[in-house]
Amino acid sequence: MALMQELYSTPASRLDSFVAQWLQPHREWKEEVLDAVRTVEEFLRQEHFQGKRGLDQDVRVLKVVKVGSFGNGTVLRSTREVELVAFLSCFHSFQEAAKHHKDVLRLIWKTMWQSQDLLDLGLEDLRMEQRVPDALVFTIQTRGTAEPITVTIVPAYRALGPSLPNSQPPPEVYVSLIKACGGPGNFCPSFSELQRNFVKHRPTKLKSLLRLVKHWYQQYVKARSPRANLPPLYALELLTIYAWEMGTEEDENFMLDEGFTTVMDLLLEYEVICIYWTKYYTLHNAIIEDCVRKQLKKERPIILDPADPTLNVAEGYRWDIVAQRASQCLKQDCCYDNRENPISSWNVKRARDIHLTVEQRGYPDFNLIVNPYEPIRKVKEKIRRTRGYSGLQRLSFQVPGSERQLLSSRCSLAKYGIFSHTHIYLLETIPSEIQVFVKNPDGGSYAYAINPNSFILGLKQQIEDQQGLPKKQQQLEFQGQVLQDWLGLGIYGIQDSDTLILSKKKGEALFPAS
């Protein structure tokens, strides 16, 4: 067998040939592996496991799904690891799956040793591995060449039911996932079909790019840092898909070298990466939206699993090592053309553009498309061009359950964790005015422009005009002190962007609905 050519000594113009010659699996070899794996699948489907310890007496496998590289069609040549997810009849909820996960693994482990078909394939090294979640791992051999294959089995709750494999599940599925309060990724196997299909139904050329990135990662990152806590291959796959979607607008005809260089460039800037999709879950549901918004506020890099909003597949890994290796890769022949010029990369933003809904009292709302990494001063320029304001713009936003925050012109939306559709409030002030926030009993708040020397009564008049609560029924507090109508804001030390608490005076009518 010829020695494999080094990627780093392959010119960029030859990358397509490199993938075809060295990375694309041979059909005969792939079929031989899958033939052995089919024996495992048949065992799982046909065997009835005897349940104990609170499980159903008759535990059956409802469905077996190949996941990972063999499942999504991006397997590399000579890959000997196959992952299977077994959906079981005894799991009726995420909570049950978590409670009985290890019991089921023991049942399968015990029964496998009694299967003559598996023993004929040289079943050995059968063990339970601690993962997220735990899995059953063992080795079998192919029938023809006796090549060893490592197979992983993960039992799972069939949360999606018999729904169409690439359609958006009902929001209730994700609501129950979020309420189950499992650790990140604990219930990912329940969504493995969606994870697989997210990659599987992609153009052939993109799969070539995925193979190239995975080969680089295995040979030049993982192999050289075997003990480091490195990101999973799935994270690299998702990053590559994002680069292709944004860089080519999902064009099936692209230059492989440009795609590869783009992924390396993105890896250099891992600290600002924030990626998510809404293919399978929608942000129109309040519980799902809250879950995703909380994820997007975390430390980057953020690559949310498109099938599981509770899992950031990029969290907690040594991306700095990956970035170092990417920097080295960009200096190699595979990233230079025949004239020794560096290959250009696609223009890929580190986060998707988002919609901002701008609200202002007395004016209809309007929408802007901005990038989270744009400076807020540029957002204000867009507002000025749209509405023609000449005064000082004060922008603020509020997340449910939190205080209203002023958006500083020197920062970006990303600084405030804003990476999805958000409503912001516009207040136009003149130089002598400050902005104050008034928090209602329901937790919502409004922004008001007022001269710091104005009386408290003047602010109450604005509140009455905007919210309908008469001045006489209002009670305002600042830092625990009730504010008197005929004293100025400055007397109380109220400064720009401070928050006042609004309540109803005792014995008054209910607070008007907003």
UniProtKB/Swiss-Prot annotation:
The modification N-acetylalanine is found at A2. GO terms for molecular function: DNA binding; double-stranded RNA binding; nuclear thyroid hormone receptor binding; nucleotidyltransferase activity; RNA binding. The lineage of its organism: Eukaryota, Metazoa, Chordata, Craniata, Vertebrata. Coiled coil: none annotated. This is 2'-5'-oligoadenylate synthase-like protein. Expressed in most tissues, with the highest levels in primary blood Leukocytes and other hematopoietic system tissues, colon, stomach and to some extent in testis. Pfam families: OAS1_C, ubiquitin. Induction: By type I interferon (IFN) and viruses. The keyword DNA-binding does not apply. The ubiquitin-like domains are essential for its antiviral activity. Does not have 2'-5'-OAS activity, but can bind double-stranded RNA. Displays antiviral activity against encephalomyocarditis virus (EMCV) and hepatitis C virus (HCV) via an alternative antiviral pathway independent of RNase L. SMART domains: UBQ (SM00213).
